[in-house]
Amino acid sequence: MCSSDLDFVAPDNYSLDAKGFAEVCAAYAREDNPFFMPETIGDANMFRAMGEYNCLGNFFFGVEVLLTPEGEVRPERQTTIDSIQCTAAAAPLLLKYQGTGKIHTFIQEDNVPTWEKELDGFSILAEYGDKRAPWSGKDWRHRSPGWMPVPQAKFKAAYGLVFQAQKHEFYFVGANVRFFLRPQLTPQTVGSSVMLGDSISQNFSFIVSVDEGHFDKNGEFVVDRKRNGDEIGRRGFWVEPDIKVLRVITCD
């Protein structure tokens, strides 16, 4: 039975595979039906729902199972906590840019080590996991076991969002990933910029600033930590949930 008072139809989406999850999203994300999921699993697929299908919100059924009776995060639920943290940090960007084509989603799939995308004036390569070199370029808080004598989380899948707000203004949120950014090649520059396996060899003079930060209540970006040196060059721009949002400003 149809009703003129029905605002929208919202699905429960418990599909575990990426294709099945996307099919449910596509079936309900229509111009005549605002897309909301009242029940779903809090995993990396939520980024696909928000970034590709303009999902207005997700409700994680059974969210109380994230914590132990003592209030500690259950290790097997850390990915859900991380995804919530990334989403909260990116909320102002999602509200501003959903439906504009400025949001790009990446989610690691089996046996796929990278993700590539052509943006406005730039090419981007996302490399999943830690860099395969003895030193990854990350700070002491985020390096993998074997290189720093501090406890580190076990391997986790990579996921997140890329926002190109303006041609030279980028925002990144996600987990277990690093990005390599370069101006798109022209016949004049193709000889001086080449992809070499897990890195990009090039001139980095187009990078103006790389900042970790967050958005305040007015939607303004606040810098918490400025990166420099090896953290912004050939080792890429790495992101993890606890750094919130990474902003990269470039120039011609």
Can you name each region flagged by the protein language model?
Residues 46-186:
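Aromatic- and carboxylate-lined catalytic core of secreted/periplasmic carbohydrate-active enzymes
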Residues 12-20, 40-44:
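Acidic-and-aromatic substrate-binding clefts and catalytic sites of carbohydrate-active enzymes
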